[in-house]
Curated annotation (Swiss-Prot):
Record family assignment: Belongs to the DeoC/FbaB aldolase family. DeoC type 1 subfamily.
Organism listed in the record: Histophilus somni (strain 2336) (Haemophilus somnus)
Gene: deoC
Reactions listed under catalytic activity: 2-deoxy-D-ribose 5-phosphate = D-glyceraldehyde 3-phosphate + acetaldehyde
Protein name listed in UniProt: Deoxyribose-phosphate aldolase
Xref: Pfam families: DeoC
GO BP of this protein: 2-deoxyribose 1-phosphate catabolic process; carbohydrate catabolic process; deoxyribonucleotide catabolic process
Subcellular location field: Cytoplasm
Length: 224
């Protein structure tokens, strides 16, 4: 796999609270230079990124109900709608983990449905926060996402105790089938890890280390 190829898997990410306008402009410039699929940013910076990325192929991804997923569904839906209005084309929402742990699966489903309805053509990714879930909970959540026809299931926020694992990526791919994307995020910081995720079913990589991933491919002549 060449660096150009893997670049189109990457959502180039900056979600921590201290990011400045210049940080976001730098992120956008890097995404343009390296042909990353998107930038993944907090919604307050969408207008800035939209202006910077106009007339480029780089998409804008943002997060909803982030990072806890415990917001009211109406708030998540409103957040998604406003983000899309501002210029986002992809929405990464956090599933309600507490409802999963409470076995309130109908509420979990309704929460996703509310955001999906608000997306109005934008692609929806559902963050499961797999480090907090059992294998059975991951399977059930993926089945709901498959039934609803979301765009992607995603492993992690990157703000909790663990990130993506090869085992969970393979499990998620097995459950959702081939028609839904699988995004690996959290802890994917080097070329070898990214390639392993892709080999096991990931079709998108969320990382703040996109340049390191690309440089690893370049420096090692695509040996992974």
């Amino acid at each position: 796999m060449q660096s150009y190829d893997i670049a189109q898997f990457i959502d180039h990410t900056a979600l921590t609270a201290e990011k400045t306008e210049q940080d976001i402009l730098d992120l956008c410039n890097e995404a343009i230079e390296h042909n990353f699929f998107s930038v993944c940013i907090n919604s307050g910076y969408i207008p800035l990124a939209r202006q910077k990325l106009q007339n480029t192929n780089v998409k804008i991804c943002t997060v909803v109900g982030f990072p806890l997923g415990a917001n009211l569904s109406t708030v998540k839906a409103f957040e998604a709608k406003e983000a899309i209005k501002a210029g986002a084309t992809e929405i990464d929402m956090v599933i309600n983990i507490g409802w999963i742990k409470s076995n309130q699966w109908e509420s979990v489903k309704a929460d996703i449905q509310a955001v999906l309805a608000a997306c109005e053509g934008a692609l929806l990714k559902v963050i499961l926060e797999t480090c907090l879930l059992t294998k059975e909970e991951i399977i059930t959540a993926c089945k709901i996402c498959r039934e609803l026809g979301v765009g992607f299931v995603k492993t992690s926020t990157g703000f909790n105790k663990g990130g993506a694992t090869v085992e969970n990526i393979a499990l998620m791919r097995q459950v959702v089938g081939e028609n839904i994307g699988v995004k690996a995020s959290g802890g994917v910081r080097d070329t070898k890890t990214a390639i392993e995720m892709i080999k096991n079913g990931a079709t998108r990589i969320g990382s703040s280390s996109g340049i390191a991933i690309i440089n690893g491919l370049t420096d090692n002549n695509a040996i992974y």
